[in-house]
Amino acid sequence: MVRPEFFVNILKEQGIDFYAGVPDSLLKNICAYITDHLPAEQNIIAANEGGAMGIAVGYHLATGKVPVVYMQNSGEGNIINPFASLTDKDVYNIPVLLVIGWRGRPGVHDEPQHVKQGKVTIGLLNTMGINYAILPKDEEGAAKQIKIAVDFMKATNECYALVIEKDTFDTYKLQSVEVNELAMSREETIQKVASNIEDNACIVSTTGMISREL
């Protein structure tokens, strides 16, 4: 497995130390390490993946450096517009290193909402013309692949995607935990809301934990 510290340090050695994105369960150890070890201004958690791409573009235009945008593959569709209108080689030709957690990979059991997205993850990258590689799960292989990605971006100014499979990164536990004094948990809040609506009312919720709890 690849230690989060190793991954972040290899990128730093290549001159990459700015991150924007939407946290993902497959990337949780990387996200935790970045949160603990980088200033807040170097790790921007965006409202959505398209917004993260916009932030990354602004960072590159201001510094000339390559940013990282991290996401779950379920957010891949959200980057199509900023990619096609800003970063693509036919427009402004701006390099962004995409780190994409591959939920629902064919042949790997996952929750139903990830199945279709898992099937089309690589196809979407091909359609957008984004070069990519599946990050090796050993540190030597990962380091070599990161260098290939960075060399490609420096030579072409194009985006490059590192696709992350399950169990690629070693465990890292977040140290800088923010303690809040909120009185209710998510589960309790959902229970209160659900118990106070009409029996024949329709509840629309997101895929994932909230729908499971309902």
PLM regions and their residue ranges:
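Thiamine diphosphate
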Residues: 1-122, 126-130, 134-214
